[in-house]
Design a protein with these regions (language model features):
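A conserved mid-protein helix/loop that constitutes part of the nucleotide-sugar donor-binding site
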Residues: 20-28, 199, 203-225, 239-245, ...
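Short His-centered aromatic/hydrophobic patch
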Residues: 92-98, 116
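Helix-loop-beta element that forms the nucleotide-linked donor phosphate-binding surface
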Residues: 55-59, 155-176, 181
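Nucleotide-activated donor-binding/catalytic signature segment of Leloir-type glycosyltransferases, i.e.
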Residues: 245-261
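A short, well-ordered alpha-helix in the C-terminal region of glycosyltransferases
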Residues: 190, 327, 334, 341-355, ...
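Short hydrophobic beta-strand element within catalytic cores of glycosyltransferases
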Residues: 43-44, 298-301, 311
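Aromatic "clamp/platform" in nucleotide-sugar-dependent glycosyltransferases that forms part
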Residues: 262, 281
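Conserved acidic donor-binding segment of nucleotide-sugar-dependent glycosyltransferases
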Residues: 313-314, 318-325, 334-339
Length: 378
C-alpha cells in the first residue's frame, strides 16, 4: 500500500457525472472536506454537470466511460489512475461505482469505503433480479473496509436481506447556507407562466422509473381538474423523458404544467413552489427531499426507507402509499384547501432539517472515518 502522508489523497468514485442525489452528496462532501487534511480526486463513469462544478472548485476529475457494473474492460484504466494519482483510500458512492472499483483496490491493497445511497435491490423487481442484486451487494460490502449508510433504514434492510456487517450510519446533509428560505432568490413564476395566486406543486428530480414521474403527472391532472389554480413544475431529465413528454401531450397538460430539463438553480426553483412532491418507489435518504424541507416547503412523499425517517404524516408532511394516484391527488388538495396546515408542515420540516441534517457535519464525520481507517493500517 502507498505510504501514509500528512494530507490524505482520496479517490471519490461515482457512477455518473449528471447530478442526482448521490452526486449532490458528493459535491457537498468535497466542498466541506478540510483540504488541509484531505485531497479529494473524483472518478466518474460519465461526464456531466457535477464534473464541471468540481472542476471549477479546483478538484482533479477523471472520466472513464462505462455504463455497466463489474465492467472488466475498465479495470486496467482504473488501476493506472490509482497509481498515477497516488491514491491512498477509495470511497465508492453507489453500487455500480463500487462494483467497478473492487478488483483495482484489491490488487493494489487500497482500503475501500462503500457509501450506500440506497440499495440496488428493491420490491418492484422480480424475485431473481432482487436475489442477484442482493448477492452483488453482499460481495461489495464484504470487500469494503467500512460501509456508510445514509439512513438507518438502509442499514436495517441490508442486515435483513444479506446479513450486512461493519456498517455505520452517517445521514445525508444539506448545505444550509445555499438552501436558506430567508435568502434572496430569483423570481421564476413569470418565467414559467405562473401567477402569484397559482398553487404550484413541484417535481424536481431525475426523470426515471425510481422517481415515478407518471404518478406525479396523473395526480397533478386530477388535482387541477378539481382546483384549476393548482399547477405543476416538472424539472428533470432521464430515461423516461419520452414517456413523460407523451403523457403531457396526450393529456393536454401544457396549459398548467411547465416542463424543463435539468437546471442548476435549485434553490430558486424551490422558492417558487408551494409543495414539493416525491412519489419515489425507493430512496436511500433523498437529498432533494432534505433540500426542499430546508427551503421550508410542504412535502408529499412515499414511505421509502429514508423518507420514513424524516417525514411524519400530518406533522411535517404528508405520506402516501406507492403508486396511489388518488391518494396523492387528495393530498395535494388537502394542502391547497388548508393553508394553515401546509404552513405548519413546512415550518416543522424546516425545523427538523436545520437541527439534524447539516452537510458540514456529514463531511466532518466522513473525514473522521477516513482518518480512522488509515490510522488502523487500512
Amino acid at each position: 500500500m502507498i505510504g501514509y502522508m500528512a494530507k490524505l489523497k482520496v479517490l471519490e468514485v461515482i457512477r455518473q457525472g449528471q447530478i442526482g442525489g448521490g452526486e449532490s452528496h458528493l459535491l457537498d462532501l468535497i466542498y466541506f472536506l478540510d483540504r488541509e487534511k484531505v485531497e479529494p480526486v473524483c472518478l466518474s463513469f460519465t461526464d456531466g454537470e457535477m464534473i464541471r462544478r468540481l472542476t471549477r472548485m479546483g478538484i482533479v476529475c477523471h472520466i472513464i466511460n462505462s455504463q455497466k457494473p463489474f465492467d472488466i474492460k475498465v479495470q486496467g484504466q482504473i488501476i493506472k489512475l490509482i497509481q498515477n494519482e497516488h491514491i491512498q483510500l477509495v470511497n465508492a458512492h453507489g453500487s455500480r461505482a463500487a462494483s467497478n472499483i473492487l478488483y483495482p483496490v484489491r490488487k493494489l491493497h487500497i482500503p475501500l469505503i462503500y457509501t450506500v445511497h440506497g440499495w440496488s435491490f428493491h420490491d418492484d423487481q422480480s424475485y431473481i433480479v432482487r436475489k442477484l442484486r442482493g448477492w452483488s451487494e453482499k460481495i461489495i460490502c464484504s470487500s469494503a473496509n467500512q460501509i456508510i449508510c445514509v439512513s438507518e433504514s438502509n442499514k436495517v434492510t441490508g442486515i435483513k436481506v444479506f446479513g450486512l456487517k461493519n456498517a455505520i450510519v452517517i445521514e445525508n446533509g444539506v448545505n444550509l447556507d445555499k438552501f436558506n428560505p430567508d435568502g434572496s432568490f430569483k423570481y421564476l413564476r413569470s418565467e414559467f407562466g405562473f401567477s402569484e395566486s397559482d398553487f404550484i406543486v413541484g417535481f424536481i428530480a431525475r426523470c426515471t422509473k425510481q422517481k415515478n414521474p407518471l404518478v406525479f403527472l396523473a395526480a397533478l391532472e386530477k388535482s387541477h381538474h378539481v382546483h384549476p389554480s393548482i399547477k405543476g413544475l416538472f424539472v428533470g431529465e432521464g430515461d423516461m423523458d419520452g414517456e413523460v413528454d407523451a403523457y403531457i401531450q396526450q393529456h393536454q397538460m401544457k396549459g398548467y404544467l411547465f416542463r424543463s430539463s435539468f437546471r442548476t438553480d435549485v434553490p430558486d426553483l424551490l422558492h417558487c413552489i408551494d409543495v414539493y412532491c416525491l412519489p419515489s418507489l425507493w430512496e436511500g435518504l433523498s437529498i432533494a427531499l432534505l433540500e426542499a424541507m430546508a427551503m421550508r416547503k410542504a412535502i408529499i412523499a412515499t414511505p421509502t426507507d429514508g423518507t420514513k425517517e424524516v417525514i411524519e404524516h400530518q406533522k411535517n408532511g404528508l405520506v402516501v402509499q406507492f403508486d396511489d394516484v388518488p391518494a396523492l391527488a387528495k393530498s395535494i388538495g388537502v394542502f391547497y384547501e388548508n393553508k394553515v396546515m401546509k404552513e405548519e408542515c413546512a415550518n416543522q420540516a424546516w425545523k427538523f432539517v436545520t437541527e439534524r441534517f447539516n452537510a458540514k457535519r456529514v463531511a466532518e464525520s466522513v473525514s473522521t472515518i477516513y482518518s480512522e481507517i488509515m490510522n488502523n493500517g487500512g
